Amino acid sequence: NVISKNENYFFEDEKFNQDKLLDFLKQNNINKILFPNPYGNEKRLKIYKFAKSENIDFVCFDRGALPDSWFFDTNGFNYDSNLYNEENWNKVLNKSQILECKEYINSIIDGNNFLEKQGKRNFNYLKDKFFVNDKKIVFVPLQVESDTVIKYFTYKPFDWSGFLDIINDTAFKLRQTHIFLVKKHPLSLKIAKSKYKNLNFISNKTNIIDAISLCDVVVTLNSGVGLYAMIMNKPCINCANAFYNFQGLNFQAHNSDELLRFLVSDLKIDYNKVLKFIWYLKNNFYSFGKSYYKKSFNNGRFYNKVYKIDFYKIVLENQCFLDVKNIDKVSYNFQSLIYTPYKFELYNKNIFIKLFDLLIPDWVKSKISHFRFYRILKKILYTKK
């Protein structure tokens, strides 16, 4: 049984009433709190921190970093969760697991299912425009300024604006040896590009797979693009706290000097560890579902809001509760045996039904058969008088 309550219910004059929350949990026999992104607003965050401090069981729910992925985390959220700790995933894989993981990675790279909408692949265009012999290419994918992981998991001097300033200064220092390609996040507001004269801002429609393929190294705060860099065997330098940041997988810069030192080094990652991490996310941590989005604008930024998820895999506390291969809806011709119980409805011959059958093809009827208006219309037309 699920009971929902807005965060405001537990606040009086903007002050969190802890006793009211505890009483509510007790009165309704609630033994676990579900948080959709506990950092989503300040009130929810206060409740989340209180729940953690009081050892109240909870589940954090949000989108994952792989295509179609979502997580139900009973330990924390994103970087603050211990479920990403290395002891959970750095385990030996057998040959079949390695092969399966590589095939999954190839399906991501060759596919067209991304966290954010991407343009068509056009690697040669990008290469012809920016490739220069003996120069390293640095790809910098930007994030939304007000995103949770920017607001809560960054540090000075690498806040959002400070990051761009440092990247611009670093690009000037390395102008003889490096080319910096920067891509704005599709949901971000406009950037004063003229302020960053040492950076090349590539088209917003550039596919990230092309950009990662072309570059020698990725530099980001804590973008999920860093995970794509890993699976494509490209070193990634994080300038903020990221849930996927571990020795051997990527590199972390805490200041501009460290960033510069990394960029002039020959960075390599341990791809065997990458496979272990991806295997863990895919098979032991993430749930998967096809999501349906609508774009909205609020508080000065664009949002992609999910209004429906068709789950085909659900994992909670390392247990799989659902795992199906196909969630595509199937349409049947009205002559199918599946409609045998409804023969009277299908063959009752009044003038309205004849018109209905004549004007509307079977495949259209099949597509709309689950809608409420269709059921009402059937009732009117087919019910015996």
Per-region residue spans from a language model:
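Short loop/turn segments at strand-loop or loop-helix junctions that form parts
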Residues: 1, 63, 135-149, 184-185, ...
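Active-site and donor-binding regions of nucleotide-sugar-utilizing enzymes
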Residues: 2-85
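Catalytic binding pocket for nucleotide-activated donors in carbohydrate/polymer assembly enzymes
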Residues: 225-295
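Catalytic donor nucleotide-activated moiety binding site of glycosyltransferases and closely related
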Residues: 2, 164-203
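Membrane-proximal basic amphipathic "stem/tether" segments
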Residues: 97-109, 306-385
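Active-site-proximal region of nucleotide-activated glycan assembly enzymes
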Residues: 52-123, 265, 269
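A donor-sugar binding/catalytic signature common to diverse glycosyltransferases
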Residues: 32-45, 204-251
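Active-site cores of enzymes that catalyze phosphoryl transfer or operate on phosphate-rich substrates
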Residues: 107-152, 156
